[in-house]
Amino acid sequence: MTRETKKLFKVKRKITPLTVLVPLLLVVLLVCAVIYDNSRIVLDEVTFSMPTLPRDMDGYTILHISDIRERLFGAEGEALDETLGDSEYDIVVMTGDLVSLAGDDTGLCQALDYFAAKQVPVYFITGEGDPPTTEIRQDGSFGATAWAQNALDRGAVFLDVPIALNEGERKLWLMPASTLVLDTESSIASLDARLLDENLDDGTVQSILYRKGRYEAFADAMAQRQQNDLTIMLTHMPCLDASLQSESTTAIFSEADLILAGHHLGGQICLPVLGALYAENDLLPRGGWFPDDRYMTGLNEVNATYQYVSTGLGTMYGAPLNFRLCNPPQISLITLTRQVDA
């Protein structure tokens, strides 16, 4: 075919206003959907059956919040009020990554002010993105860091030892997973040995005494736990099948009747039908690409242990990826019941 013949059969594509407007409209709709999704907070309501739950705790409700990061709720907690409405809950638990990547705790303080006004107790653990909770200051003194002190001043409790949520023959314990790897006896002995050093400054001595006190409190709480007690365990990082297969970790997490976790933000970027695109975790198959939903969101059974994973409120990346796609910010209302068929 000659060049002249090709020219005869060449179809000229005419650019019309419609061919420009349709893709542009789709982009605008997508942007609007993303903005809407990121501006709201959805409430995931879950019922978890614990047949041996003490009768006086039947219906006990936990508000689970995770990964606040850069999320703001308004000076009066308006965003929380809009989502929760008239919902009732007995306690609030927060499972880490509570301050922004820049170390800003404004969102956390707004949330704590809101719950303090409602006189609801709040317990929190930290995530890998949170600054330390204690420090030796420049003047040599030891104490809470600024963000942790802000939380404590608002009535929140840093959960570094198990706490019984009720009295009675069978207790329901709230327990931080991080402390279960401790060998308290050897840890206390090691700290006692360090205290023999006469060259320690006052801040270091106070830091050691604080840690020793927490280890002793942990040992006391564990000694009070009975075999038939129930345990809700808080962990920032969700437990995976792989992480539950060693004898040590299986022994740790078998203590829990229910694990509450966060961290992955549901993948942050999700695709319709396919789910989460990627999650940062070296233990996940495929290097974290298209991770199993059991580790991303909701109530699932992981190696014979029930675990609820919140998709959280914030984002794991800075600009321009500080948005969520097909995955709106979430808080969760978990009701415990004695009913087996709940």
Which residues does each predicted region cover?
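Membrane-embedded segments
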Residues: 60-157
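Binuclear metal-dependent hydrolase catalytic cores centered on His/Asp/Glu-rich metal-binding motifs
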Residues: 134, 145, 153-155, 168-234, ...
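Conserved beta-sheet core of the metallophosphoesterase superfamily
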Residues: 238-329
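A short C-terminal boundary segment appended to hydrolase-like catalytic domains
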Residues: 3-13, 19, 311-342
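Active-site neighborhood of phospho(di)ester-bond hydrolases with catalytic His/Asp-centered motifs
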Residues: 63-66, 91-97, 121-128, 159-161, ...
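N-terminal membrane-anchoring alpha-helices
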Residues: 1-56
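Beta-strand-turn-beta hairpins that frame and shape the catalytic cleft
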Residues: 49-63, 156, 162-176, 181, ...
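Acidic/histidine-rich helix-loop elements
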Residues: 35-37, 62-78, 98-106, 131-142, ...
